[in-house]
């Protein structure tokens, strides 16, 4: 690797705010916030909304179920215009 062109790779604490879960992962992410971890060391800190702890694919749970499809929504919105017969 060429020296001086690659970002610093280090451990970063990610906080999944939707389920209040913390985990440490190696990353090149740059942040000004820090947090003291369980091992007593200070790491960069970054908040996220979705991770493997909260994503429906990994948890097997659906959060929001869409009641209508896009076509049904379109038909409902534009039904008032009726159909034109030529």
Swiss-Prot record:
One of its GO terms (biological process) is translation. InterPro entries: Ribosomal_bL28/bL31-like_sf, Ribosomal_bL31, Ribosomal_bL31_B, Ribosomal_bL31_sf. PROSITE patterns: RIBOSOMAL_L31 (PS01143). The keyword Ribosomal protein applies. The keyword ATP-binding does not apply. It comes from the Bacteria. One of its GO terms (molecular function) is structural constituent of ribosome. Pfam families: Ribosomal_L31. Keywords: Ribonucleoprotein, Ribosomal protein. Gene3D superfamilies: Ribosomal protein L31 (4.10.830.30). SUPFAM superfamilies: L28p-like. GO terms for cellular component: ribonucleoprotein complex; ribosome. Part of the 50S ribosomal subunit. Belongs to the bacterial ribosomal protein bL31 family. Type B subfamily. This is Large ribosomal subunit protein bL31B. It comes from Vibrio vulnificus (strain CMCP6).
């Amino acid at each position: 690797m060429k020296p001086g062109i690659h970002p610093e790779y280090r451990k970063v604490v990610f906080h999944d705010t939707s389920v209040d879960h913390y985990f440490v992962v190696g990353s090149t992410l740059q942040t000004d916030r820090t947090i003291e971890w369980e091992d007593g060391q200070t790491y960069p800190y970054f908040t996220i909304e979705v991770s493997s702890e909260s994503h429906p694919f990994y948890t097997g749970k659906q959060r929001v179920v869409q009641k209508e499809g896009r076509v049904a929504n379109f038909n409902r919105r534009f039904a008032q215009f009726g159909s034109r017969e030529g």
